[in-house]
Amino acid sequence: AGAACPLKDDAAAIVERIVAADAIAFATPIYFFEMAGQMKTLLDRSNPAYAADPAFRDVYLLATAADEDAHAFDGATKGLQGWGDCFEQARLVGVVTATGVDAPGAIEKRLHEVNRARLMGCGV
C-alpha cells in the first residue's frame, strides 16, 4: 500500500471505503464545464487506492448543470474516466446527467433523469 496521507481529515477513511466498495457512484454539480472541486480533490486524494488492489469494478457518474448544453458534462466525464483508467479492473459503466438544474429542488422536475438514475442504481 502507498504511504499514509500527511493531511489529517476524513479523506483517508473515505478512500478506505472506496477501496472496499464493489461499485462507486460519484455525484457532482458541474461548474465551468468541469466536476466540482471537492470531487476532483477526493479523486486526487484517493491516490493510495492505486496500490491497494481495490475491490470496485463499476464506476458511475451522476451530474447536474445549470447550462442547457449536454456537452457541459464532457470535462467531468473525461476526468472521471481518466481516474478510472488508472485502475485496471475499473470501468465507467453508467452516466446520468441533467441540464437546466440551477436551483435547489430543480432536479425534482427532471423526472426522466431521476428515473434513469434510479434504474441505474437498481442495477448495482
Give, region by region, the residue ranges found by the protein language model.
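Short cysteine clusters
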Residues: 1, 5
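Helix-loop-strand module that forms the ligand-binding subsite of alpha/beta enzymes
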Residues: 6-88
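Glycine-rich phosphate/pyrophosphate-binding loop and the adjoining helix
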Residues: 85-124
